[in-house]
């Protein structure tokens, strides 16, 4: 596992960097998705409470018989009531509406894409009857660029009306939404704060992609090398998100971080866990099954943070990897830990 491929996509005059890397070594209320499972025995006007017994049971279930002591993660705080995880498995279509090459979200027109997503959700619910699967639209709201732009930041922020479109689509199918950010040569916190009005909604969550964070790589052009984000940068955003949760009386925010190499997040052990957040480390490398499982083992299983995610590529895991099909749901459910967030690109 010693090679990495970085693909830069030129789409509509923009450089859109996709997470197409070879592996190495909205308006539906999100609390309705999680709280129905998380909250037990309360009257209509009662203050929500967390079903900690069910939470513990599901966390042990996700550990999948691990005897190493890594999973479930020790000393993690219980989430605030209304938490989506581990009461639900998130099944997400990822992409950008300006590109049909960055992921499933954008690859097909809405009328074709939505039924495909819901079919994947149903198949996941059928494959794992213990944890309900729910749909998500995971939108790349800030994309890394191959040119510096007017401010020299090598990133492009999508117009708000694009995100409004995604929120409207999500409302139609009771899906949650992720805003995903590739910062280029910008700083992480201000790029996240740019979308505060959306992150203040209960059904909108955050994803960040260290692959295209270039400040820790000498400020080189995104796509030339794999980028990096430190735990300190991640924690700064975590503190900000936790503040939004408290200020707006929201259920916990999911905070998803892409990872397929050690250097993308060199110090995951220092990521701070908070009741207001649910941290998902998403293994998003592509390739044949043995390569993907190895990457998952090294950077997810052996370096636990809180929750685990797994990305599947409709094209890169098959045509570009010499495989007839992607890894099956049964194969993924056999991993330790079981991934609770599934992303399709």
Predicted regions and their residues:
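Substrate-binding cleft of extracellular glycoside hydrolase catalytic domains
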Residues: 123-125, 132-211
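Substrate-binding surface in catalytic domains of secreted glycosidases
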Residues: 210-250
